[in-house]
Amino acid sequence: MYANALVCLNPSFIKLQFHIVCTMNIIGIVTLALCSAASAADEGAAYNLQRAPDYFESFVENYNKNYTSDWEKNKRYSIFKDNLHEINAKNGNATDGPTATYKINKFSDLSKSELIAKFTGLSIPERVSNFCKTIILNQPPDKGPLHFDWREQNKVTSIKNQGACGACWAFATLASVESQFAMRHNRLIDLSEQQLIDCDSVDMGCNGGLLHTAFEEIMRMGGVQTELDYPFVGRNRRCGLDRHRPYVVSLVGCYRYVMVNEEKLKDLLRAVGPIPMAIDAADIVNYYRGVISSCENNGLNHAVLLVGYGVENGVPYWVFKNTWGDDWGENGYFRVRQNVNACGMVNDLASTAVLA
């Protein structure tokens, strides 16, 4: 019956129908392929480098990028394409295996050197004091739990965003003080990074600083005000402390720790709370999620906060709080493999403060 009906149809109509069906199928296949590629890229799979211009235009739109000239846009596109190559290489790295993935993010039009210069900020001031007492932790590590995370006890404040102000040192320092305050008073407060940026006479504001010198400067100033009383503006200014507004936290001392191995860091973390630490941030720029196993260790340039540790699929990891906003990494956090000095995390001495 269907054969007879087909014979009765006008041949030109049949040709038209066939053309429409084929065209729709082709469009569907192409659309599916493009969507699949985009979805795979979002999940950290390989980016199709032939589609780099499309990825870049989407990136510009998604992150509201504005370039001052065609020359600048072309330069950013070139860097963006280089970063795609690196992301693909990292996602195919057998060292990290399936544990860490990388993807396009808001930094993907910046070179590593540009990002380190603008969005980190760990550096050595010309004048370096050292009032913090050094403690050597040479006892064998305790047999503590395999998993521990201060976030689960509501002792870690929200993710901050330092922007293009190189004051990671202030953010990491105060994040640890905020956690110690929460451990003592069972409530979270946001302290003023801008106060340290403006009023710390040793460190260099948005041009860099160190963790232990920040603790020392807090002691010299007498304390820290809240973020509400002295809000963040992300640039260097003259010190604008209002002496009529109270310091909510004061410090009476600080410590720096020498440890025989990373395992001892677990004991310290559980005992004193989240710990500010120095790292090399070059390899975490395009991080998306998972545990980083392979991370550069070519010089410390960024400060972050150690908040926990655990094991995933047999891989032991550390959890760090970053200061690049909650739209980066795992909602603002990242994880690295334990016991490999990932990102140079144990190159410098860990520091903590003592609340008054």
Swiss-Prot record:
Keyword annotations: Disulfide bond, Hydrolase, Protease, Signal, Thiol protease, Zymogen
Alphabetized Gene3D superfamilies for the sequence: Cysteine proteinases
Signal peptide: 1-40
PROSITE patterns: THIOL_PROTEASE_ASN, THIOL_PROTEASE_CYS, THIOL_PROTEASE_HIS
Cited InterPro entries: Papain-like_cys_pep_sf, Pept_asp_AS, Pept_cys_AS, Pept_his_AS, Peptidase_C1A, Peptidase_C1A_C, Peptidase_C1A_papain-like, Prot_inhib_I29
Pfam families: Inhibitor_I29 (PF08246), Peptidase_C1 (PF00112)
Enzyme class, first EC level, given as a word: hydrolase
One GO process term, biological-process aspect: proteolysis
Enzyme Commission number: 3.4.22.50
Catalytic-site annotation from UniProt: C168, H302, N322
S-S bridge residues: C165-C206, C199-C239, C295-C343
Presence of keyword Membrane: no
Post-translational note: Synthesized as an inactive proenzyme and activated by proteolytic removal of the inhibitory propeptide.
CDD domains attached to this UniProt entry: Peptidase_C1A
Gene Ontology molecular function terms on file: cysteine-type peptidase activity
Catalysed reactions, semicolon-separated: Endopeptidase of broad specificity, hydrolyzing substrates of both cathepsin L and cathepsin B
Pro-peptide region(s): 41-144
Biological role: Cysteine protease that plays an essential role in host liquefaction to facilitate horizontal transmission of the virus. May participate in the degradation of foreign protein expressed by the baculovirus system.
Family: Belongs to the peptidase C1 family.
Protein name (database record): Viral cathepsin
Gene: VCATH
